[in-house]
Amino acid sequence: MPGIQDGPSSSLFKPLPFKGNVAMSELAGAGISKEMAAAIEHAPGGACVCWGIPFEVGDVVVVAERAISVEFSPTVAQWLVFMHTSDVRPVEPGPGGFISPMRGEGQLGERAADYAMLYADGTQERVPIRRRHQVGAFDRRWGENCFEAVAQHKPRPVRAAHEQLRPVWGLTQMRVDTADSGPWVNWLWAWENPHPEKALVGVRFEPVAGVVVVAAVSAGSVSSLPLRWQTRRKAVLTLPESEGFWPELDEDGLLGQIQLDMGQVISAASRLVYPNDAWNDTYNNQLPRKSERDVLIEYTAHPDACFHLADGRVVPIVQLASAQPSIPLQALPPATQRVNLRVVERGSGKCVPVKLHVHGAWGEYLAPVNRHRIPNPAWFEDYSVDFVHGATWVESGDNPHYCTYIPGETAIDLPPGKVYVEVAKGFEIRPVRKMVEVTPATREIVVEIEKVLPWREKGWVTADTHVHFLSPISALLEGSAEGVNVVNLLASQWGELMTNVGDFDGKTTWGSKEAGGDGEYLVRVGTENRQHVLGHISLLGYRGKIIAPMTTGGPDESALGDPIEILLTEWARQCRKQGGLVVLPHFPNPRAEHAASIVSGDVDALEMTAWGNLYEGIDPYSLSDWYRYLNCGYLTAAVGGTDKMSANTAVGTVRTYARLDPQAEFTYQAWMEAVRRGETFVTYGPLLEFVVDGHPPGSRIEMPASGGTVDVLWQVASVTVPMSRVELIVNGEIRESVAVPPGEASGHWSVRVNKSAWLALLVRGHYADKPEIIAAHSSPVMVTVGGGALLAAADAVTILEQIEGALAYLDTVGTRAEDVAYKRMRLVLVAAHRTLHNRMHQQGTYHGHTPVTDHAEHH
């Protein structure tokens, strides 16, 4: 098992060897989970240095069914440092997939063990070991960090890509190296013999000026200049049944299974198989299937070149023109027909920005001439106006669906025959899939799209609250093509990397009439301010100077060595002073200080996040966390944001719908006001309207102490994700549920309310070949009965525990700022904790006390 040596060892510490009760080789059979057992090979063993502290890992102690004592040599020390971890503790969702009480997968605050420190005089000191405090899980959910412990490897600097031998970040985006430079370059020249029928017997080299070095001479006969290759072509290689595709390139850019002599294979990937025969009837963004044996290759070569296959066969490229069973290669028709493609709005005939996909009969992606043929989905490696559905931040995936964004018109090179076009523009326009036959006479293709859901006309505008890295103009194109009226482009800091900082000016709204646009699609640059453990916060639309520092407290958000000098709550207050909107991004993670920010009333909205996945829907984990705040009376609106950081995520995959004041013109300011009111819903496709006694989401209704009945009216519709059920959520539980048709439905319920409550609408749906998801969710309507505020004791306790965790992190392993800043931040957290704690006392709710809230009268 690998040892960890993350730096030199400090002489101020020494290992304390002991005899454990389980050998590492036997750990899998010691009652641990199968997930932990599968990870044993990665567990550190032997001599280790972690954060500069030496450890010796031998037999381990499994603290499970009985107490285990270990002995070591008498040692006088001020500190003992433990290297330990814990197994996973599954979280079991209840009805509807929701979790209550919500402590997270890390089981925040749960007492995992007690450690008793034994002294030579027979006395002992006992310490409770709590999850996400003194110990974490061996495999944690992102954002659920420890407050008083650190991971086994200390943070490390990483060389910029251009400082590494390979890959070279910028140059690799070109996907080509001319290879015409270096310490020594020989040049090749081809001379055409005017008398090929005559024999050549030698060459004499005569000097004239300077020095020439001739290294070699070669002779041959080909049909044309041997150093001139033809334009790019495509072919399909069929592999043997027992052989998979090997995509790796060697240092010379060569594949292992197919190479060219007088030419070069440009790219190779498993062929994508689309449902071409039923293309018009399949759904938008549906992923293709990856062929198990066919590899689509691009190449450029001399007409007399040959392919060399892994089994030793040599295939002249001239043989590809006619399919032969004995040859595992087949040529594809070249895409040489230049066509103008336009997408127009039905009725007006106006060209409109859209998302576009085109492929040929063999599944080959056909990009416009000014777009990437091979889009790059990796994190921060490409900021192009492309979308690679099915990819991840680190790879294109097995079956990517390539798309791009166009302003309504583009030039594209197409092959003869059938090509398959997909056009989409948001959630209110019906997506189009159509087949087009390309002939020598084809010069233009026109695709007409139709708006069928009138939510914009009803006053609703759409937004993505969380986009990174794009330029403002690229964001404007992608937003308009996706039907997203407001794109919030967020500058931030990532260690030593600053992004979009130069785009922030605190005043410009791109696309607005003041900025020369039509005012229908807007881009505003804000900031995402972050701390790795305490959390992230999005500051939108604020005016004036950038709120800096944008990150604090060290990696992987701010630079290594940065202290914690400001809290999320303080950033939020500054944003509001500058007229901005405060959103908690990718809620609920990181799960720490945002509890204090919500309790303090400094947050306008919580963000449900997609991260590129079109099929997972709104995460019940996220909703469960949101519900506990609603259950305690904290009305915070729901918004949707993608956290787009690469081409694997489309702007608006999940989006916010917010209804403007009927008297207000659409502006960025009007949108912020709508979110502050809470008249919003979040969706992956289905659209909704929802009122309680005529009051929209974000409203508060007062009822007498006797309670009463409220009328709930709703309407839903979708032209993208087919709907399956509509549910009424009351205080985090499903009160009503009804099956609905996939395209449109409406209904009403009469609901008895005997105590203070919140009500929200949830829509489920799914494509025929996908599992059901939560596809849309409204912000709530709050109902107060007899003036009694909502306060669910079990949820309130978990909120207090989360604030206590933030305090513990600030007090222990968080890099300490100067004393004044530390005390200021601590007061902010303590004040939030006391606010909720005092509410519990006022209500007479029984709860345990921690050192933060302990009172003498409780003993």
Which residue stretches match the model-derived regions?
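Acidic, His- and aromatic-enriched active-site or binding-groove loops in soluble protein domains
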Residues: 222-224, 603-615, 660-668
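A short, Gly/Thr-enriched small/hydrophobic beta-strand-prone motif that recurs across taxa
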Residues: 79, 332-348
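Short domain-boundary/entry signatures in modular proteins, especially
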Residues: 220-223, 331-338, 449-462, 683-684, ...
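Surface-exposed acidic, glycine/proline-enriched linker/cap segments
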Residues: 153-182, 375-409, 505-512
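C-terminal functional module detector
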Residues: 245-248, 252, 262-294, 299-327, ...
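Flexible loop/turn segments at secondary-structure boundaries
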Residues: 89-91, 135-136, 210-213, 224, ...
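Catalytic cores of extracellular degradative/oxidative enzymes
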Residues: 405, 456-638, 642, 648
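N-terminal/edge-of-domain interface segments
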Residues: 1-297
